[in-house]
Amino acid sequence: MAQILAPSTQWQMRFTKSSRHASPITSNTWSSLLMKQNKKTSSAKFRVLAVKSDGSTINRLEGLLNLDITPFTDKIIAEYIWIGGTGIDVRSKSRTISKPVEHPSELPKWNYDGSSTGQAPGEDSEVILYPQAIFKDPFRGGNNILVICDAYTPAGEPIPTNKRHRAAEVFSNPRVIAEVPWFGIEQEYTLLQTNVNWPLGWPVGGYPGPQGPYYCSAGADKSFGRDISDAHYKACLFAGINISGTNGEVMPGQWEYQVGPSVGIEAGDHIWASRYILERITEQAGVVLSLDPKPIEGDWNGAGCHTNYSTKSMREDGGFEVIKKAILNLSLRHKEHISAYGEGNERRLTGKHETASINTFSWGVANRGCSIRVGRDTEKNGKGYLEDRRPASNMDPYVVTSLLAESTLLWEPTLEAEALAAQKLALKV
């Protein structure tokens, strides 16, 4: 018998040839995960994950997990996904659907025990799931699907953690629809070693070298978790998520992926689906996913969720003037945005490590130390988009995107407030 061993620090994967009917992520990719100890950075001993032999339970389970049921039945598996009681955790459960579907309206509503997720009292615990968006399931393959849902009381009222409902109202406003709001969201995240709550690739209880060599790097001494990032990238493309790129971040063990441009409510649906997929992949890899905006105190970058935003008017000739008016509105609602941009963001927005101070609104061209950054191409072309650098990595994309649309398209400041803000920000609007 051969033992499969896992360290508490460095690891790397060995890919083997998948079964012909294997789905993208449940194939031998993860079952052949090979863990290697980094003796230079950790004295931790190997721990036994499993004992494997030719006729092992692992091999038999793998065969069942990789079954392609499509030739044998029209039925599919739908994984219903919703946001839990913390507002950042994702929950899910599966059900059988009689045939493949093309639209969430073809799916039945469902329910769950809200008392077990912190979303309902025990004496009235039923919460109803409304299917809102569907994606291909990269774990099961075939016609199986992931279903993004929002949650309601039995009376049809959105529960407090259902932020999608309010966002859908904003994005269905005719004034917002006419402006076709685009969003490009940069989701940063940190990978942690299981059981020690310490970044992947870091010596347990210690620190790597200072920041500098890690951003967009390659090499076993600089890049930690690339296989997870790449597996997530491909799984999102398979699912139909509008993922547009990925890169290693400034802090070692931290990564980023980008979703968009997406229109309106779609941006939130795609981010939540991508987060769920990332949680599942890190689960299979034995690594913990953290969306904490400042996972490590000290001279280390935090984790944000920069949100790029434009409207039809911003993208057309003369759009830079529209962008400046939007910046003015955002400055006047700075407190409202900060309060909705993620838990613990005050630990990240310090004015250091490519952030602006949480207490002061600022904007600039190509300045990553500002609240709102405008790219040089936008300034040069006189049209384009703005980047809101304030949202934390654990922000709710439904809240952030709808608030941007509301503040720039639906909310009107008083003339006096507008004039004072324009003078303060040196904006001629």
Curated annotation (Swiss-Prot):
Subcellular location: Plastid, Chloroplast
SMART domains in alphabetical order: Gln-synt_C
Keyword Mitochondrion: no
One GO CC term, this protein: chloroplast
Tissue: Expressed in leaves and stems. Low levels detected in roots and nodules.
Note: There are at least four isozymes of this enzyme in P.vulgaris. Irreversibly inhibited by the herbicide L-phosphinothricin (PPT).
Reaction catalysis annotation: L-glutamate + NH4(+) + ATP = L-glutamine + ADP + phosphate + H(+)
UniProt entry tagged with the keyword Chloroplast: yes
Tree of life domain: Eukaryota
Subunit annotation: Homooctamer.
Family: Belongs to the glutamine synthetase family.
Name the record gives this protein: Glutamine synthetase leaf isozyme, chloroplastic
